[in-house]
Amino acid sequence: MQALVQVRGPVDMSRDIQDTLEMLNIHSVNHCALVPETDTYSGMVAKVNDYVAFGEPSEAVLTDLIESRGEPASGAGDVDDAWVAEHTEYDDVADLAGALLAEETTLSDAGLAPVIRLHPPRGGHDGIKTPASDGGQLGKHTTEEIDHLLTDMR
């Protein structure tokens, strides 16, 4: 499972890229979606590579992200261990995060909103016009790099 975070805005973005981001449930800057690592999604991720940061997060960071920024699909409330135990088949948020990373379930199937709305990163982006391989923010990240970005955006 990969976490995709849109870091660039819609200015001069082609309609094809906008459509692909909408299909990935990413509708705005600083929104995050979790997508499985299949051939179909790999092609979509490659298409939006110049507008997103993506990588596989660790279970601990995903647990923190769901607890702090996760939202129920309907209604309001905090997503904590009690909510997860009551509304899903998992005992706590850590079990849910593990199932998400193992691609056993999705945020929507678990009763959560399919997108995680994040804050801008504390300390700013490392460069939204430069790929991660050159020290920027765009494109594929290692687990440590995407964990650092998601932690800064909690």
UniProtKB/Swiss-Prot annotation:
Region named Disordered: 122-141
Origin: domain of life: Archaea
One GO cellular component term: cytosolic large ribosomal subunit
CDD domains xrefs: Ribosomal_L7_archeal_euk (cd01657)
Biological process annotations from GO: maturation of LSU-rRNA from tricistronic rRNA transcript (SSU-rRNA, 5.8S rRNA, LSU-rRNA); translation
A Pfam match: Ribosomal_L30
A GO molecular-function descriptor: RNA binding
Coiled coil: none
Keyword NAD: no
Annotated keywords: Ribonucleoprotein, Ribosomal protein
InterPro entries assigned: Ribo_uL30_ferredoxin-like_sf, Ribosomal_uL30, Ribosomal_uL30_arc, Ribosomal_uL30_euk_arc, Ribosomal_uL30_ferredoxin-like
Subunit structure: Part of the 50S ribosomal subunit.
Similarity comment: Belongs to the universal ribosomal protein uL30 family.
HAMAP family: Ribosomal_uL30_A
UniProt name for this protein: Large ribosomal subunit protein uL30
Organism encoding this protein: Halobacterium salinarum (strain ATCC 700922 / JCM 11081 / NRC-1)
Lineage, uppermost ranks: Archaea, Methanobacteriati, Methanobacteriota, Stenosarchaea group, Halobacteria
